[in-house]
């Protein structure tokens, strides 16, 4: 029984699927998708639960969310193993994901009050008050690269605001989704407040088309995000938050400390086997002796990265990709860029056929035209050389995406120029592109999102503002508007 609807664990009536470890092929999870009727039933349960949940005092909702945080801490090792085995990422990295989930609770509570709390301004004859109200029933679509942390970043603020939810994990990480929901169940959520439906494209399509849905919170690929945007077009009553991918540039202007610059680049491009939406996909390196030395060192160190199993000892820097198919897609993208005229500096290599273990690849594309402006979700880094900083900014902005951008330089003025001219939601200076602060908004523009950044700003799209003018007494103004006559007429 792999669906949780209205407080009950039930068996899906849709397509049968199983999930295996992408490296060992060990079967980890088996179950059935939710069919259309079960998706509708989850929405009905959420709608029925909404009035009571929304009317709960905030402290009551907060107590359940904080109980969930306690359970995450108590089951950290178990959830870490589930995430690592299902995604293929190393244990150390999965542990950081669970830690981020735990930390999200306190941050979300603080953000709720800072972004959507109640504010009152005193007026001469009363008060003006800003309050916030939950939307109602929201769908949360989870990704596979951070199957615990990223959905958590939607679920927690949405529940705190008083919404009820239908959660569909990625079909590539159903086990993590189920494990997390079981912790929510133990935290004491009332029936119907949070519902779990498993499934792939058909389940997601059925969920996004529900008439009684008040909004959809999505993290995933640009192609799916665009599809959801089309499906919900003409429905302004529904809130849609899209956090999509990126074709992110990292500019290496000044690499005086070459090893530090190489380390930053590895963290930006290859962590999580390149499966972070903020990963550097395009490396822009200044022409010259220093740039040459940096690239040579980068190829040297990156060539020593050996992906390994989730539980290898010692732990590897990167594990497998989410699937063998995902690894093959990276290989195909590399061949495509070679065919366009790219010069391979480091060839990506499958460690073992039939698995998702893939070594990093680096290819130079300086002067190559017609390179697809797409997100290759894996450890493939494309290099362009440039002569002047203005050219670097032009190259950085030459994409339909706008998620993250980074600069390695000792010149503060160059960073100030980048801040003015970069078209990206995250702009880092001498910090990895994959680094983000939970106390800041997280999101991008263009094909990377629809101006609904998450993290610190997630509270914004989980509630709508209600403005009031209020006075305990009704009084006639001392000064009336022109043309109004309230004089008493004498009776004839």
UniProtKB/Swiss-Prot annotation:
The organism is Salmonella arizonae (strain ATCC BAA-731 / CDC346-86 / RSK2980)
Q: Which residues does the annotation say bind NAD(+)?
A: 220-225
Q: Which reaction does it catalyse?
A: N-succinyl-L-glutamate 5-semialdehyde + NAD(+) + H2O = N-succinyl-L-glutamate + NADH + 2 H(+)
Give the top-rank taxon of the lineage listed in the UniProt record for this protein: Bacteria
Matching entries from Pfam families are given as:
Aldedh
Family named by the database record: Belongs to the aldehyde dehydrogenase family. AstD subfamily.
Top-level class of the enzyme under EC nomenclature = oxidoreductase
Cross-referenced Gene3D superfamilies: Aldehyde Dehydrogenase, Chain A, domain 1, Aldehyde Dehydrogenase, Chain A, domain 2
InterPro entries xref list: Ald_DH/histidinol_DH (IPR016161), Ald_DH_C (IPR016163), Ald_DH_CS_CYS (IPR016160), Ald_DH_CS_GLU (IPR029510), Ald_DH_N (IPR016162), Aldehyde_DH_dom (IPR015590), SuccinylGlu_semiald_DH_AstD (IPR017649)
Q: What is this protein called?
A: N-succinylglutamate 5-semialdehyde dehydrogenase
Pathway assigned to this chain's UniProt record:
Amino-acid degradation; L-arginine degradation via AST pathway; L-glutamate and succinate from L-arginine: step 4/5
Q: What does this protein do?
A: Catalyzes the NAD-dependent reduction of succinylglutamate semialdehyde into succinylglutamate.
Q: Which SUPFAM superfamilies match?
A: ALDH-like
Listed EC numbers = 1.2.1.71
Any one Gene Ontology BP term: arginine catabolic process to succinate
């Amino acid at each position: 029984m792999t669906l949780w609807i209205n407080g009950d664990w039930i068996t899906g009536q849709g397509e049968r699927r199983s999930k295996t470890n992408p490296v060992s092929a060990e079967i980890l999870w088996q179950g059935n998708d939710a069919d259309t009727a079960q998706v509708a039933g989850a929405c009905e349960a959420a709608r029925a639960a909404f009035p009571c949940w929304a009317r709960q005092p905030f402290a009551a909702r907060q107590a359940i969310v904080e109980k969930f945080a306690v359970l995450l801490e108590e089951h950290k090792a178990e959830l870490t193993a589930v995430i690592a085995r299902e995604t293929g990422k190393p244990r150390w990295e999965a542990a950081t994901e669970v830690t981020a989930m735990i930390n999200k609770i306190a941050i979300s509570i603080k953000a709720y009050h800072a972004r959507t709390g109640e504010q009152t301004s005193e007026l001469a004859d009363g008060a003006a008050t800003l309050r916030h109200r939950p939307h109602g029933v929201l769908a949360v679509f989870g990704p596979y690269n951070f199957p615990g942390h990223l959905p958590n970043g939607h679920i927690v603020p949405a529940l705190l605001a008083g919404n009820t939810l239908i959660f569909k994990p990625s079909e590539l990480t159903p086990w993590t989704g189920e494990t997390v929901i079981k912790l929510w169940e133990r935290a004491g959520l009332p029936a119907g407040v949070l519902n779990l439906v498993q499934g792939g494209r058909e389940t997601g399509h059925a969920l996004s088309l529900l008439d009684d849905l008040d909004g959809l919170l999505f993290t995933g690929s640009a192609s799916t995000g665009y599809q959801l945007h089309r499906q919900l077009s003409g429905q302004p009553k529904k809130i849609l938050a899209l956090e999509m991918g990126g074709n992110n540039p990292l500019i290496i202007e000044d690499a005086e400390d070459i090893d530090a610059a190489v380390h930053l680049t590895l963290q930006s491009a290859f962590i999580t086997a390149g499966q972070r939406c903020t990963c550097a996909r395009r490396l822009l390196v200044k022409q010259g002796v220093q740039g040459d030395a940096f690239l040579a060192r980068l190829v040297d160190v990156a060539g020593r990265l050996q992906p390994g199993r989730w539980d290898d000892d010692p732990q590897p820097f990167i594990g497998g990709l989410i699937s063998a198919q995902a690894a093959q897609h990276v290989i195909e993208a590399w061949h495509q860029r070679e065919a366009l005229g790219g010069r391979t500096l480091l060839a990506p290599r499958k460690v073992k056929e039939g698995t998702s273990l893939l070594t990093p690849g680096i290819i130079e594309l300086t002067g190559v035209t017609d390179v697809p402006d797409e997100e290759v979700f894996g450890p493939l880094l494309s290099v362009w050389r440039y002569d002047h900083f203005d050219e670097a900014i032009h190259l950085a902005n030459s994409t339909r995406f706008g998620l993250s951008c980074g600069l390695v330089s000792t010149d503060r003025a160059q960073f100030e120029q980048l801040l003015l001219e970069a078209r990206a939601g995250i702009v880092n200076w001498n910090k990895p592109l994959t680094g983000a602060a939970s106390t800041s908004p997280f999101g991008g523009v263009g094909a990377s999102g629809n101006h609904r950044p998450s993290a610190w700003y997630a509270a914004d799209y989980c509630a709508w503002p209600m403005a009031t003018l209020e006075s305990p007494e009704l009084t006639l103004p001392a000064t009336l508007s022109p043309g109004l006559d309230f004089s008493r007429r004498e009776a004839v």
